[in-house]
Amino acid sequence: MLVLGIETTCDETAAAVIERAPDGIGKILSNIVRSQVDEHAPFGGVVPEIAARAHVDLLDGIIDRAMREAGIGFAQLNGVAAAAGPGLIGGVIVGLTTAKAIALVHDTPLVAVNHLEAHALTPRLTDGIEFPYCLFLASGGHTQIVAVTGVGQYVRLGTTVDDAIGEAFDKVAKMLGLPYPGGPQVERAAAGGDAARFAFPRPMQGRPDANFSLSGLKTAVRNEASRIAEITPQDISDLCASFQAAVLEATADRLNVGLRLFREQFGAPRALVAAGGVAANQAIRGALHDVARQAKTQLIMPPPALCTDNGAMIAWAGAERLALGMTDTMEAQPRARWLLDANATAPAGYGKTRAGF
C-alpha cells in the first residue's frame, strides 16, 4: 500500500510517501519538510496568515518533490492522507483541499487524519509496536497522556489545564529575549546554567490525577527575571536550567501517575511512547528514560525528525486507517480543534482546557 501524506497544521509544510506492507510493516519512501521559521522569526512566533500563505506557495512543490523522491506517480497511490486538524485553520484548509483535489482527479481514497492521531501512531511506523501503549504527547499546542488501544481508540488519562509544555518553553524564551523558535533556545541556554539557583515550583506534583499545569511555573520565571536589575547571559542560562529542571521533575511525576492509571484500566502497557515536538528535547528524552526504567517498561521515542511535524506521520496514520477500511468523503471538514479522545471532558474544576479543546 502506497500513501501520500500532507501536513500543514502549523508552520511546517510537509509531504511524504510511505509504503505499508500487508504484515503492517512500514517504510518511508520520501519525507520532505519545509520549515517556515525564517518567515515567522521577525514576529517572535507563528503568524497564522503568513503560515497559510506560505503553505499555498510551497505545498505543490513539496508534494512534487516527495513523489519524485519516492519514484512513483499519482496513479500508483492507494490513498491520499491530509491532516484535517487540529491546527491553524488556514493551513489546515490548504492541506486538506489539496488532498481532496488529488484524490478526486486520480480517483484515489481520501483519509482526513487527526494530527494528534498521527503523532500517536508514529511509533508503529518506526518500531512496529503492538497495542496497547501509553502515549506522552507533548508539543507547542498539546500536552496529554493517552492510552492507545487501537487505531481510532484513545483514552485520555491526563492533559494540561492551561499551557502546553512547548508553549511554556516558547513563552519563557520570549520573556528572556531568546530568539524564535524558543524551545531549542531554552534547551541550549539551560545546558550552561545552574539548575539549582532558582527554586521554581513543581506544578501539580503529588496530585492523584495525571493533569499538567505550566502557567504558574511560567509566572515564577517572569517574577525571578524581573528581580534581576541587569540580566546577564549567565542569569538567562540559570533561569532556563531551573525552569527546565522544574518541567522535567513535574513531567516525571505526572507520567508516573499516568502509568498507574493506565495499569488500573488496561493492564501493563507494552511501552511508554513519547511523541510531539517537545519529545525532541534531549533533556526531556533523558527524563523519560528514567521514568520508563523506574516503571519497568520499555521506552519508545521516534527519531527527533519524526517527533516534530512531518508528512510521514500523516501518511502512516492514513495507511493504518486504510488498512481497516476507514476512508473519508469529499465532505470531510477542516477543524481548528479536534479531540483525540472524542469522549474526553475538561478536568473537574478547570472548565475547558486550552490544549485539546
Swiss-Prot record:
Question: Per the record, GO CC terms?
Answer: cytoplasm
Q: Which GO terms describe its molecular function?
A: iron ion binding; N(6)-L-threonylcarbamoyladenine synthase activity
Chief subcellular location equals cytoplasm
Stretches that traverse the bilayer: none
The EC category is: transferase
What this protein catalyses is:
L-threonylcarbamoyladenylate + adenosine(37) in tRNA = N(6)-L-threonylcarbamoyladenosine(37) in tRNA + AMP + H(+)
| Protein residues bound to substrate | 137-141, 170, 183, 281
Q: Which UniProt keywords apply?
A: Acyltransferase, Cytoplasm, Iron, Metal-binding, Transferase, tRNA processing
- EC numbers: 2.3.1.234
The entry marks the following residues as binding Fe cation, namely 115, 119, 309
Q: Origin, by domain of life?
A: Bacteria
Q: Where in the cell is it found?
A: Cytoplasm
Name a biological process GO annotation.
Answer: tRNA threonylcarbamoyladenosine modification
Q: Which InterPro entries match?
A: ATPase_NBD, Gcp-like_dom, KAE1/TsaD, Peptidase_M22_CS, TsaD
Q: Which cofactor does it need?
A: Fe(2+)
The free-text note explaining how the cofactor binds reads: Binds 1 Fe(2+) ion per subunit.
- Gene3D superfamilies assigned to the protein according to its UniProt record, in alphabetical order: 3.30.420.40
Question: Which PROSITE patterns does the record match to this protein?
Answer: GLYCOPROTEASE (PS01016)
Concerning its family, UniProt says: Belongs to the KAE1 / TsaD family.
What the protein does comes down to: Required for the formation of a threonylcarbamoyl group on adenosine at position 37 (t(6)A37) in tRNAs that read codons beginning with adenine. Is involved in the transfer of the threonylcarbamoyl moiety of threonylcarbamoyl-AMP (TC-AMP) to the N6 group of A37, together with TsaE and TsaB. TsaD likely plays a direct catalytic role in this reaction.
Classification via NCBIfam families: gcp_kae1, T6A_TsaD_YgjD
Name of this chain's protein: tRNA N6-adenosine threonylcarbamoyltransferase
